[in-house]
A protein has these predicted regions:
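A well-ordered secondary-structure block
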Residues: 49-130
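Short, solvent-exposed mixed-charge patches
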Residues: 134-135
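Short, well-ordered surface patches within globular domains
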Residues: 1-54, 58, 100-105, 109-111
Length: 135
């Protein structure tokens, strides 16, 4: 997923996003929350997506520019290629991938969601400090 993200950004004349262990952790915790609550939502279990960024220590300063992409699929619909293609076809998700961010955290978790076993949940958390973001 990271390679596809960096490739898409490169084609758009943008730089690669830095790895962020904190955003990786927040993305992992968010995907786990989606599966635990059986709720595919940016507010799974009643928590805003920024909750997990705060828990991971990413939003420790006053001003951040952040975004979240979330997807799920079963079988071939849960592959990296399938999910990335869907994100790039969605204006909101594409905006995050090509957005003015400096860091990326990713998670892929498998579990049961909405009665579907072996569901793959993908989470991408994007972030940058407001001083470096222009949007």
């Amino acid at each position: 997923m990271r390679c596809m993200t960096d490739f898409a950004r490169s084609r758009a004349g943008l730089g690669a996003l830095a790895d962020s262990p904190q955003l990786d952790l927040s993305a992992e915790d968010k995907a786990a929350d989606v599966l635990r609550c059986d709720s595919f939502s940016h507010t799974a279990c009643g928590r805003e997506f920024t909750y997990w960024m705060q828990q991971a220590g990413y939003l420790s300063e006053a001003c951040w520019h952040v975004g979240e992409n979330l997807a799920w699929g079963v079988g071939t619909y849960g592959t990296v290629r399938s999910i990335f293609r869907a994100w790039m076809r969605s204006p909101e998700h594409r905006r995050n991938i090509l957005g003015d961010y400096e860091a990326l955290g990713l998670s892929r978790q498998v579990g049961e969601l909405e009665g579907q076993a072996d569901t793959v949940v993908w989470t991408a958390h994007f972030g940058s400090h407001c001083e470096t973001a222009t949007s």
